[in-house]
Amino acid sequence: DEGLRGYAQVVQNKDEIIKEVRRQIKNGVDWIKVHVTGLIPNQKEEGEISVWSFDELKLVCDLAHDLGTPVVGHVRNAKGVKDSIKAGMDFILHATFMDEEAIDLVCETKTPIAPSFTFQANLADFGQAIGASEDYRQIFKKEIDDNAEIFNKIHEAGVPLICGSESGFSITPYGEWHYRELEVFVKDIGMTNLEAITCATKNASKSVKMENKVGTLEEGMLADLLIVDGDPLKDITILGDKSKLSHIFQNGKEIKRDQESREITPPQGWRLSPFSDGILTQELAKK
């Protein structure tokens, strides 16, 4: 990736980092996201490789914060988690493969984390429907199994966990799997249904610094409401059952859903998964 796919921009040195952070903030971004870790050919260890130094991460965080902008990082190894928190990152995506030192640091700082396990869970549970190999399915299932206990531990310690959907990839197309992370939080991490719902609403709004607008049902907040036919405190999957979605309100206005659903078309090439050969919809997963 040379910075030409999607919205990413590759930077190579201090000057490029400063220039790019300033450019993005000038253009009005709400957050700066850093891909702290990544995959490399012939990789041997689990997780990903740290591709940013601590000094580089500190430069991004200090500069962005000086310009009033928070920073989030994609991190999938222990070193990356520790470096990101020490550099001042506001929020971490994934945070898998943590060691004890990283766990202690997360618990001490209460840095918000979004595991975003929906991608892995869909591939593990429904991968056969889209041509994923059994090897890949087991790899992603193992990532959830190996890290679920860690997330339960930090959740019990008061670390804010929030629900990320990974929506937009062929395995997690928009409009299909937004509820799925709540199911993973209940089934794998061991939360109650209400705790998972809180992670998707109140915790999420605080973590992305929007708690004065969304996340709770209070006077003065945006009236974004999902009314379902059933009790999600008894069955969390109701939130993903389109036949059970009674009413949807956005900013106080009901969203009309009497039109036929639009066909889900293939995403951009860079969002196609090398692990599958199709788009995973709920309908396909149930076959």
Residues covered by each model-derived region:
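Conserved, mostly hydrophobic/aromatic
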Residues: 28, 32, 64, 166, ...
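Active-site mouth loops of central-metabolism enzymes
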Residues: 1-19, 70
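Short, acidic/polar
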Residues: 12-25, 75-80
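Active-site core of metal-dependent hydrolases
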Residues: 36-149, 162, 167-169, 188-191, ...
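His/Asp/Glu-enriched, well-ordered alpha-helical/loop segment
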Residues: 66, 143-231
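Alpha/beta enzyme core
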Residues: 21-34, 40
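Active-site microenvironment of metallo-dependent hydrolases
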Residues: 156, 201-287
